């Protein structure tokens, strides 16, 4: 787009060369140019912050405003052709001061201020707009809202005129200024009206012209309808005035340029003379014309947005509220700066967030290395970048947006921080558990000399130190969430829970080792007691030394052995548990579980001994000890004269008394079951469901079991007792019959006549042997050999050797016969037929010859492996 003979720069994507002559801020159609910010960036004004100044020029059309600016600031605004009298500047144009490049050799004290922006405003009273003064009013309001200095370009001969001296325009400026001040009642921003009197001849002193203009301005101000509260205000409350005169450009060109050069030195920072200050703080200006109070306090990087917002309010005929516009600008720019700061923050923090999220999703939170420094640096840089750019804007908005930015940053950093502590928490607890377990195993290998409580305390201290170190390395200074005491407290509680669980597990393992020890001791002791049944009569099971145990007190002895063994186990358990730093409640629960488990071991052992096969075997052994041996333990040799029936009846009845005795666990001393319920005790109040889930219910102890103590102590039911009694009697009857047969067998004798007959018939053979020395000697040698063989118990081996030799001879004969038959066809056919028939017969015979399974013997009991940890038991 081309305007005023130059590129307006309103089209998107303009090249930087398009901005060499400035940029059209507002075109003749009242449209704001969105590329103003690009122009400021091109001129390197954006980073200047508050170090810039904005000047606007007013005046009638075709009065040389653009010419003045071009000569004064080195700009390239379009000027009117000398051959035509028409509008040249359309809308509002903006350009940066270029005079600095032309004045490098000037005095540094008199050089112009940096970053001076000049706005060339469309002239007033032009024929193109005619009586349409809407744009004049809007452009005046826009210039007043944005500019520090308003240059009024008038001719000397127009001073004293109303229209010619732009008094109508100035009245508009004053009116809109009052509107602005009415909205902004918290401050009173001032502006400088700089009157540049063109074609100044010097005939009328400049001071007189100045007085005339000030009189006209005061008169206009007095005629204004002022809002409430400003009735007594004066023009000097809001404006400062400066005046300068310039010779005719065409008639006095050299002098014109000299005066322009002098005028340019006034466009620099100045200050008020402290000696001339009045009660309102105003006074004469020294140095340059740019005072801090003129500046609108809009940072350079936000000027384009601010100007666009102001113009939007003006062009839409809305009340222009500069404080609101400044706040809106501050919000807009602070949001932009915040987003830019968050971009750099994202680049630094997003990789850590991604890693943490992946680790959490995988179920294995990971402690991220270098997270703390990255968080601190990212937060510091983001806040610093925001402060650098945003601190120039509205203070309240800046502080609010800074707080919002910090909230966003801290929300993400807090999530990372908590995630890091969560990962450190989980890994720390896991490492603590593994370290304790490893130390316990190492102690067990050294001979069970480890102190579990000391191991836990040491590893717990190391775990807490590591957690605190990780937490401190992740802290972010000045962050409200940067405190890990709550997480540390949770971590310590979790370590306590883990320690308690490890202690309970270790006590469970200790209880298991003690139970194995109890099982081993009870197994041996109970075996000895049941094996001693019947030894009271001095049979084969009688002890070699000491008193012979009574069968009636077997349960008393078993109970005493059981109680003593468990008491010893409890003592060992308590001593070892004290090294675990276990509480009294935990020890009570452990002892209670040990007693219940031990009773289960004893009951299982008794049930094993009371199995039908084992019990019948014990009854038979008991009966045979009483029947086959006398009271002195000497085996009986039955004779026909012995009273076998009486001995049999006594032994059988004595053995039958064992069945009811063994059927019920009852103490002979009290004739009642042992006090199992009192011995085990009540369930400890600290016991948990987990402590009871693996325990076998005990009748008379557990109310919900539904069995009484009497039923718990019943080992053999009535039906089983009757069956065992019948079967035992049959076994005893068999022993009795065998004894009876052996006694009767000794009564049979050879008749006497048989010896006479044998002597008569064998007389010739007797004489032959006696008369022949060889036969006699052979008979004598055979007799001696037979005697020696008998004395040496060699008849058995000789008979076996003979049988083996005969068997081998028979097998060898069969083999040779088979080879002979296989050599002929007839023999092979006969063998095949014989084999088929024999297979059938063997199958039938195998079914008939199957032996029934032997009655259940004593169950093999495998020796239980005892761990190295059981050595102390």
Swiss-Prot record:
Segments on the Cytoplasmic face: 1-749, 795-873
Transmembrane segments: 750-770, 774-794
EC class: hydrolase
Binding site for GTP: 59-66
Feature: compositional bias, Basic and acidic residues: 839-863
Keywords of this entry: Coiled coil, Endoplasmic reticulum, GTP-binding, Hydrolase, Membrane, Nucleotide-binding, Transmembrane, Transmembrane helix
One Pfam family matching this protein: Sey1_3HB
Signal peptide: none
One BP term from GO: endoplasmic reticulum membrane fusion
Coiled coil spans: 482-506
Keyword Coiled coil: yes
PROSITE patterns: G_GB1_RHD3
Lumenal side: 771-773
Domain GB1/RHD3-type G positions: 49-307
Covalent S-S links between cysteines: none
GO cellular component terms attached to this protein's record: endoplasmic reticulum membrane
Topology within the bilayer: Multi-pass membrane protein
EC number: 3.6.5.-
Known function: Cooperates with the reticulon proteins and tubule-shaping DP1 family proteins to generate and maintain the structure of the tubular endoplasmic reticulum network. Has GTPase activity, which is required for its function in ER organization.
HAMAP family, per the entry: Sey1 (MF_03109)
Similarity section: Belongs to the TRAFAC class dynamin-like GTPase superfamily. GB1/RHD3 GTPase family. RHD3 subfamily.
Name the UniProt record assigns to this protein: Protein SEY1
Native species: Ajellomyces capsulatus (strain NAm1 / WU24) (Darling's disease fungus)
Encoding gene, per UniProt annotation: SEY1
């Amino acid at each position: 787009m081309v305007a005023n003979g130059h590129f307006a720069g309103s089209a998107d994507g303009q090249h930087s060369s398009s901005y060499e002559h400035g940029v059209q801020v507002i075109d003749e159609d009242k449209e704001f140019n969105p590329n103003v910010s690009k122009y400021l960036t091109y001129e390197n004004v954006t980073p200047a912050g508050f170090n810039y100044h904005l000047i606007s020029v007013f005046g009638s059309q075709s009065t040389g405003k653009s010419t003045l600016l071009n000569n004064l600031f080195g700009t390239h605004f379009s000027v009117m052709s000398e051959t035509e009298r028409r509008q040249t500047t359309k809308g509002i144009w903006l350009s940066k001061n270029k005079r600095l490049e032309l004045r490098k050799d000037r005095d540094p004290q008199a050089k112009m201020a940096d970053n001076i922006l000049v706005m060339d405003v469309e002239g007033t009273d032009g024929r193109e707009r005619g009586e349409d003064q809407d744009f004049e009013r809007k452009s005046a309001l826009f210039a007043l809202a944005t500019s520090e200095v308003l240059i009024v370009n008038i001719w000397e001969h127009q001073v004293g005129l109303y229209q010619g001296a732009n008094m109508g325009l100035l009245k508009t400026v004053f009116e809109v200024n009052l509107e602005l001040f009415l909205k902004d009642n918290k401050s009173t921003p001032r502006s400088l009206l700089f009157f540049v009197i063109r074609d100044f001849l010097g005939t009328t002193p400049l001071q007189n012209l100045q007085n005339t203009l000030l009189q006209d301005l005061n008169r206009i101000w007095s005629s204004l309808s002022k809002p409430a509260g400003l009735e007594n205000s004066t023009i000097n409350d809001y404006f400062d005035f400066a005046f300068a005169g310039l010779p005719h450009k065409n008639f006095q060109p050299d002098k014109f340029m000299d005066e322009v050069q002098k005028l340019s030195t006034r466009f620099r920072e100045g200050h008020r003379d402290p000696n001339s200050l009045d009660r309102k703080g105003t006074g004469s200006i020294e140095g340059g014309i740019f005072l801090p109070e003129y500046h609108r306090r809009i940072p350079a990087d936000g000027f384009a947005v601010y100007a666009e917002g102001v113009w939007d309010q003006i062009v839409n005929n809305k009340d222009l509220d500069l404080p609101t516009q400044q706040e809106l600008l501050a919000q807009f720019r602070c949001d932009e700066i915040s987003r830019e700061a968050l971009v750099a923050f994202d680049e630094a923090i997003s990789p850590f967030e991604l890693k943490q999220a992946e680790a959490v999703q995988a179920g294995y939170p990971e402690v991220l290395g270098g997270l703390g420094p990255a968080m601190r640096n990212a937060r510091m840089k983001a806040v610093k970048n925001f402060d650098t750019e945003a601190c120039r804007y509205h203070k309240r908005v800046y502080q609010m947006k800074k707080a919002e930015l910090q909230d966003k940053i801290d929300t993400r950093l807090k999530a990372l921080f908590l995630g890091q502590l969560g990962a450190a928490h989980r890994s720390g607890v896991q490492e603590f558990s593994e370290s304790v377990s490893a130390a316990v195993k190492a102690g067990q290998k050294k001979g069970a000399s480890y102190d579990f409580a000391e191991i836990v305390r040491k590893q717990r201290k190391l775990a807490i130190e590591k957690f605190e170190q990780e937490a401190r390395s992740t802290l972010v200074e000045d962050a409200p969430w940067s405190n890990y005491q709550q997480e540390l407290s949770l971590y310590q509680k979790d370590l306590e829970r883990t320690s308690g669980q490890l202690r309970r597990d270790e006590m469970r393992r200790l209880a298991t080792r003690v139970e194995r020890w109890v099982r081993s001791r009870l197994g041996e002791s109970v075996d000895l007691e049941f094996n001693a049944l019947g030894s009271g009569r001095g049979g084969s099971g009688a002890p070699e030394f000491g008193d012979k145990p009574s069968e009636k007190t077997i349960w008393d002895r078993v109970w005493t052995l059981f109680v003593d063994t468990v008491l010893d186990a409890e003592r060992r358990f308590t001593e070892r548990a004290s090294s675990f730093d276990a509480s009294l409640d935990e020890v009570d629960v452990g002892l209670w579980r040990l007693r219940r488990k031990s009773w289960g071991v004893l009951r299982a052992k008794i049930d094993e001994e009371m199995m039908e096969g084992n019990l019948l075997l014990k009854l038979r052994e008991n009966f045979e000890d009483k029947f086959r041996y006398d009271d002195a333990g000497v085996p009986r040799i039955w004779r026909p004269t012995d009273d076998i029936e009486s001995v049999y009846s006594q032994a059988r009845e004595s053995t039958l008394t064992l069945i009811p005795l063994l059927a019920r666990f009852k103490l002979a001393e009290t004739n009642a079951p042992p006090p199992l319920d009192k011995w085990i005790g009540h369930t400890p109040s600290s016991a948990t469901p987990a402590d009871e889930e693996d325990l076998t219910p005990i009748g008379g102890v557990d109310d919900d079991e539904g069995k009484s103590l009497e039923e718990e102590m019943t080992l053999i039911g009535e039906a089983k007792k009757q069956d065992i009694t019948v079967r035992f009697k049959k076994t005893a009857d068999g022993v009795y019959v065998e004894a009876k047969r052996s006694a009767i067998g000794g009564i049979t004798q050879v008749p006497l006549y048989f010896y006479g007959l044998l002597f008569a018939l064998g007389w010739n053979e007797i004489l032959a042997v006696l008369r022949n020395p060889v036969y006699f000697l052979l008979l004598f040698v055979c007799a001696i050999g037979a005697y020696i063989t008998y004395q040496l118990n060699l008849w058995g081996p000789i008979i076996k050797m003979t049988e083996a030799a005969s068997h081998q001879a028979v097998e060898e004969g069969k083999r040779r016969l088979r080879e002979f038959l296989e050599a002929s066809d007839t023999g092979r056919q006969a063998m095949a037929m014989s084999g088929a028939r024999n297979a059938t017969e063997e199958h039938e015979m195998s079914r008939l010859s199957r032996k029934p399974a032997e009655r259940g013997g004593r169950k093999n009991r495998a020796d239980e492996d005892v761990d190295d940890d059981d050595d102390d038991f």
